[in-house]
């Protein structure tokens, strides 16, 4: 049985197009027997914003404040969740050409030297290996493979840095460029999702 972690990151609630696609994917994969865990980073599972105190605490050490200890424990939980699943599905709507702050915050909690990556004499090495990632990205305009897409290249870089190099991408483009473009973008994205195996 495939174990899947789904990360939602939209802040738009019931208006979220990425959530529609993620729910479609979850339903599709559940019929294939996948065990799915959902973390709604833009909703009920929003994380504390990583500030200087938290960032310092995530390095560990003996002299941690109570808050730092709590945030380190939260980070450990998120990392364990990441490592426990075979496939990581990331809902990544484009906000102002990049990812939502809530998703970036999750990255800041799990990208830890000595935990999810390390530095060697030949450069960095990811420690979260043998995983697969699926990015489901929605955007109001048409940005795929262009200079204004700071979503997919960035996420591929981060995932590769921690060891996840098997990355598939589902695009839903031009969703704010009229009803026909919206319907076409969502239909094509759902078709792409239907081709994915859990």
Swiss-Prot record:
It holds the Pfam family Flavodoxin_2. Disulfide bonds: none annotated. InterPro entries: Flavodoxin_fold, Flavoprotein-like_sf, FMN-dep_NADH:Q_OxRdtase_AzoR1, NADH:quinone_OxRdtase_FMN_depd. Its cofactor is FMN. Homodimer. PANTHER family: FMN-DEPENDENT NADH-AZOREDUCTASE 1, FMN-DEPENDENT NADH:QUINONE OXIDOREDUCTASE. This is FMN-dependent NADH:quinone oxidoreductase. The gene is azoR.
């Amino acid at each position: 049985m495939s174990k899947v972690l789904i990360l939602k990151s939209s802040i738009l609630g019931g208006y979220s197009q990425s959530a529609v696609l993620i729910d479609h994917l979850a339903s599709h994969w559940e019929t294939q027997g996948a065990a799915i865990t959902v973390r709604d980073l833009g909703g009920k599972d929003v994380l504390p914003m990583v500030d200087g105190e938290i960032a310092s605490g995530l390095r560990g050490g003996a002299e941690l404040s109570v808050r730092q200890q709590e945030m380190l424990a939260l980070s450990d939980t998120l990392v364990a969740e990441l490592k426990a699943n075979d496939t990581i599905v990331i809902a990544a709507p484009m906000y102002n050409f990049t990812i939502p702050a809530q998703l970036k915050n999750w990255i800041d909690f799990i990208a830890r030297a000595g935990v999810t990556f390390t530095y060697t004499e030949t450069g960095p090495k990811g420690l979260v290996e043998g995983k697969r990632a699926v990015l489901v990205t929605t955007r109001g305009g048409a940005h795929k493979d262009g200079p204004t897409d700071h979503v997919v290249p960035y996420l591929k870089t981060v995932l590769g840095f921690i060891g996840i190099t098997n990355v598939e991408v589902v695009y839903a483009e031009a969703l704010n460029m009229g009803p026909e473009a919206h319907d076409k973008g969502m239909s094509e994205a759902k078709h792409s999702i239907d081709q994915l195996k859990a």
